[in-house]
């Protein structure tokens, strides 16, 4: 799995370099930049290192930041009892079934129906659930949610999405700098620095927004895989039951708080335009995919 992911990463970066080379050749940008003292290869390497570096720093800090920002209380199995002990035991059993190292397990207090997995590697991961999820879902549904999150860990989704984000970061940095430099040459010398600075900021924001559509697309494909993995671990019916409970919570007109919480999670949404930025496919599509699968 690791070699396959690295191979995909290398292939993606080769395609990035080839695409940039073709674009610069067709537009005649390369000689123009060289004539003005900008080395295209050096800029590309710089953007790649910073883009990937930022993505991996975020990955390395992901577990720490999640605990701090979400207020996750990690369960100590030596002193846990009641619902905490039951939750820990469920994760332990599912992790053993998936042949995974035991992750840290935590609970954070929030009315939203949510759970997530994070961490830089399979051996250093965290699975956390909200108190709202534990209050809303029954045992079978909780089992499905936990299996889904552990499937993310087993599939290496945190690393995969980091690689994709790093490539997008590199693209954003590279093209925003190239275009901002080209725009700055169209004004007087004394205004070039200001134009280049402002254009770089505006283009970086614009390209980042467009790049997030690409990242969200890949994230949605990983969600389907995690659903399939969760179905294998906990059973298809448990996985479907969990998603159906989420859908009922989201669709309940009297529960606007639950609707807002799920919309914040980007689990689903009624705005077709915003669906491009959603990291999760529509719940209806996920349920249908599971019902049509053979798990």
UniProtKB/Swiss-Prot annotation:
GO biological process terms on file: proteolysis
Q: Where is it located?
A: Cell inner membrane
Supply the PANTHER family for this chain.
Answer: PROTEASE HTPX
Co-factor binding details: Binds 1 zinc ion per subunit.
- Report whether Manganese shows up as a keyword of the record: no
Q: Give any Gene Ontology cellular component.
A: plasma membrane
Q: Where is the active site?
A: 149
What topology does the record note for this protein and the membrane? Answer: Multi-pass membrane protein
Entry keyword set: Cell inner membrane, Cell membrane, Hydrolase, Membrane, Metal-binding, Metalloprotease, Protease, Transmembrane, Transmembrane helix, Zinc
For this entry, the protein name equals Protease HtpX homolog
Q: Which GO terms describe its molecular function?
A: metalloendopeptidase activity; zinc ion binding
Organism from which the protein derives: Leptospira interrogans serogroup Icterohaemorrhagiae serovar Lai (strain 56601)
